[in-house]
Amino acid sequence: MRTTSEVMFKAPGRICLFGDHQDYLGLPIIACAIDLFIEVSAISNESEMFHLVMPDLKTSRSFSIHESFNSLEKGDHFASTIRVLKRYGCFPNKGYSVTLRGNIPINAGLSSSSAIVVAWVRFLLITFGCSKEITHELIAKIAHESEVLEHNSPGGKMDQYTIAIGGMIFLQTNETASFTKIDSLLEGLVVGESGIPKNTLGLLGDLKEKALCSIETVQKHDATFNIAAATLLDIEKYIHLLPKELKLFFYAAIKNHL
């Protein structure tokens, strides 16, 4: 456990280069961290409370380091992270006053919320330790469990793994979550913000549901169909089995993967 009273961490936003909307289907993606960050600064407050301040959102909250969070409010990733980390042997034993701020645009598709979760996980693990070796992969795994699995959210693994590992990666988003770092620089790439808010969870939930439904419909007719091994020929072979409202999602699931 760290003995210094002040700690600072940061986590980047991310962009998807190839395979957008494929990670929740367990298909591979290529994504890249960007030079916009969420920063966490924390000072020991000699209490048994976490005091969180988020000036960019003009909000704050406090809770006991002993809080169990047996029930979760939707989207409360601070609480779900505490709950998940206890399963990994991470038990906070002193309070901190924590400030989270950053320059990643919110609701802009750059994973600001995942960056907050990754930074929060990293702070807690490094500060209080756990029963496993702390690696970038472990931080990504815990962040994914805290943000997605614990809330039954529709997202995949791309955001948490890209942000926690950093740089550019090729990621298998299936159960293995294996990755390869790509040692290349994307010089001159500019990310523009439209200013139009993105309803991430609502959009992902709808797209994931329809994509999975189209795949499951095909598998009812052919149990050997595997989206990870699908080719363009499979579109012609199976699309007639689908109702009109699912055909586009089946086409996209295969075409985007190739």
Model-assigned labels for residue ranges:
Residues Q22, L27-P28, C32, G102, ...:
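Flexible, active-site-adjacent loop/turn segments at secondary-structure boundaries
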Residues M1-S114, V118, R122-H136, I163-M168:
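ATP-binding N-lobe of GHMP and related small-molecule kinases
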Residues M1-C16, E39-D76, K86-R87, F170-L258:
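C-terminal nucleotide
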Residues A108-G192:
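Fold-level recognition of mixed alpha/beta catalytic cores in primary-metabolism enzymes, strongest
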